[in-house]
A protein has these predicted regions:
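Generic, well-ordered alpha-helical segments
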Residues: 19, 45, 49, 76-79, ...
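Glycine-rich, flexible loop/turn motifs
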Residues: 3, 9, 44, 60, ...
Length: 173
């Protein structure tokens, strides 16, 4: 089962084209300016089968056009990498473009496999400066930067996303 917080149909912000955005529950970061603070607790959300999510995506496929698809966001989707892998394989088999919006802070064999199945990774860099990153998120940015380097080395498509928040991440350097 996949622990889902909520859905957004016809999303236009989280990847190219029109997208079904699936917000997953749970995040190891504690960002001071979190856009989805209700997704942080791993105990929230609704247990949902991969089949239910697949059916929802397939039913909306006509609206995706050539550029759209499905985006998994959160929270932090890689916390549920093992449960997402079979779903990503089914989505690919159905010709649905997959984006994964991640902070890149988790790494293991399952996360690597999940990223390999993803068509486009949306990598959120919270702060490049290590000290400010820890202040903003409660975590180191070392793994996030290693994830960016891995994506680059693999030639895997990704977008770096940096949220500019006055007073938090709007430093001149």
């Amino acid at each position: 089962m996949i622990n889902v917080h909520s859905y957004e149909s016809m999303g236009t912000f989280d990847g190219p084209g029109l997208r079904l955005v699936v917000f997953l529950q749970g995040c190891p970061f504690r960002c001071l300016y979190c856009a989805n603070p209700d997704t942080i607790d791993v105990k929230g959300g609704t247990p949902t089968s991969a089949g239910e999510i697949l059916q929802m995506a397939v039913s909306q496929k006509a609206f995706f056009g050539k550029k759209g698809g499905i985006t998994f966001s959160g929270g932090e989707p890689t916390l549920q990498a093992e449960a997402l892998i079979p779903l990503f394989k089914d989505l690919k088999a159905n010709g649905i473009h997959i984006c994964l919006d991640t902070n890149g802070g988790i790494w293991n064999d399952k996360v690597e496999e999940l990223l390999s199945l993803t068509d486009l990774v949306l990598l959120d860099i919270k702060e490049f400066n290590p000290e400010r990153h820890r202040t903003l998120t409660g975590r180191s940015n070392e793994q996030t930067l290693r994830t960016a380097a891995w994506l680059e080395q693999q030639g895997h498509p990704f977008w770096l996303r940096y949220v500019l928040v006055p007073g938090y991440s709007d430093f001149e350097e």
